[in-house]
């Protein structure tokens, strides 16, 4: 795309160089050529030339008005002032319609066919779509045609020339955009902090749970070991009675024997 725009930029520079040494009818003819030239869609540098501005004082003031219209205006503006402006050639008319599409695209991302037909003063949908396709091929807009819903969906459009009086509004818009970006950034930072805090809390809780599980396992293991020892001891006591209980009958027998002996 950049490669396609370079020849147009060079062409505009050539027109500007030619215009610097031109005046009168030669200058108006040059302006007409610029307005017809393929790929040339910005005219601010040409408008800033002193000899071009001098046209406002003479009989060719209408050409300066027409150049201003191509720089900042739209096709409806031309129709509204048609009586005081030079007649457009077919190429100039198509270019001004292209610029009108760009102006609409800068305000709306989905442009209804009905709006385009009205502003471009067209009745035939096929001709409208052909005009849009021409604008796409010249790289002044990018988008697609939604024929089912009769919309032009815009992805990109070039910037048009800017009036000096509009600069303050542009600066204000940029400041508002920057403020909006800062607000979004602050919101993201707060979400990151919350996410990190949640992660930290979750990690701490997980560690506590793991520690409790480990303690419970140790307790269960110790309890199981103690129970096993008690059971073994009980079994051992049942199988092998204490020696003290086995010796008691022997003592009794000894006493009996003593009594028997004393009687004899």
Curated annotation (Swiss-Prot):
Ranges where the record places region Disordered: 223-264
Presence of the UniProt keyword Chaperone in the record: no
InterPro entries: COPS7/eIF3m, CSN7_helixI, PCI_dom
Start-end of Basic and acidic residues biased regions: 235-248
Coiled-coil stretches noted in the UniProt entry, renumbered to this chain: 194-237
Localization: Cytoplasm; Nucleus
Pfam annotation, one family: CSN7a_helixI
GO biological process: COP9 signalosome assembly
GO cellular component: COP9 signalosome; cytoplasm
Residues recorded with modification N-acetylalanine: 2
The organism's place on the tree of life at top rank: Eukaryota
Keyword terms: Acetylation, Coiled coil, Cytoplasm, Nucleus, Signalosome
Annotated Polar residues bias: 223-232
Domain PCI stretches: 2-159
PANTHER family recorded: COP9 SIGNALOSOME COMPLEX SUBUNIT 7/DENDRITIC CELL PROTEIN GA17, COP9 SIGNALOSOME COMPLEX SUBUNIT 7B
Annotated family: Belongs to the CSN7/EIF3M family. CSN7 subfamily.
Self-association state and partner proteins as the record states: Component of the CSN complex, composed of COPS1/GPS1, COPS2, COPS3, COPS4, COPS5, COPS6, COPS7 (COPS7A or COPS7B), COPS8 and COPS9. In the complex, it probably interacts directly with COPS1, COPS2, COPS4, COPS5, COPS6 and COPS8. Interacts with EIF3S6.
Its biological purpose: Component of the COP9 signalosome complex (CSN), a complex involved in various cellular and developmental processes. The CSN complex is an essential regulator of the ubiquitin (Ubl) conjugation pathway by mediating the deneddylation of the cullin subunits of SCF-type E3 ligase complexes, leading to decrease the Ubl ligase activity of SCF-type complexes such as SCF, CSA or DDB2. The complex is also involved in phosphorylation of p53/TP53, JUN, I-kappa-B-alpha/NFKBIA, ITPK1 and IRF8/ICSBP, possibly via its association with CK2 and PKD kinases.
Protein's UniProt name: COP9 signalosome complex subunit 7b
Source organism per UniProt: Bos taurus
Lineage, broadest ranks: Eukaryota, Metazoa, Chordata, Craniata, Vertebrata
Gene it is expressed from: COPS7B
């Amino acid at each position: 795309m950049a490669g396609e725009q370079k020849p147009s930029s060079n062409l505009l520079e050539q027109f500007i160089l030619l215009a610097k040494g031109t005046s009168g009818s030669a200058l108006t003819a040059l302006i007409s050529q610029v307005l017809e030239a393929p790929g040339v869609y910005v005219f601010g540098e040409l408008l800033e030339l002193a000899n071009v501005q001098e046209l406002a004082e003479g009989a060719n003031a209408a050409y300066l008005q027409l150049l201003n219209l191509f720089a900042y205006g739209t096709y409806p503006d031309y129709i509204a002032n048609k009586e005081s402006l030079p007649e457009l050639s077919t190429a100039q008319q198509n270019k001004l319609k292209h610029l009108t599409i760009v102006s609409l695209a800068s305000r709306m991302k989905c442009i209804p066919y009905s709006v385009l037909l009205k502003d471009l003063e067209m009745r035939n949908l096929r001709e409208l779509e052909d005009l849009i396709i021409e604008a796409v091929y010249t790289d002044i807009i990018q988008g697609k045609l939604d024929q089912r819903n009769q919309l032009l969906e815009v992805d990109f459009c070039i910037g048009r020339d800017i009036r000096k009086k509009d600069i303050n509004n542009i600066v204000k818009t940029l400041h508002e955009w920057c403020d909006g970006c800062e607000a979004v950034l602050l919101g993201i930072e707060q979400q990151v902090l919350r996410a990190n805090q949640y992660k930290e809390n979750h990690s701490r809780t997980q560690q506590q749970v793991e520690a409790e599980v480990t303690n419970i396992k140790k307790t269960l293991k110790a309890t199981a070991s103690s129970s096993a020892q008690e059971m073994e001891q009980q079994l051992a006591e049942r199988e092998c009675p204490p020696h003290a209980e086995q010796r008691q009958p022997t003592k009794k027998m000894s006493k009996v024997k003593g009594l028997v002996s004393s009687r004899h």
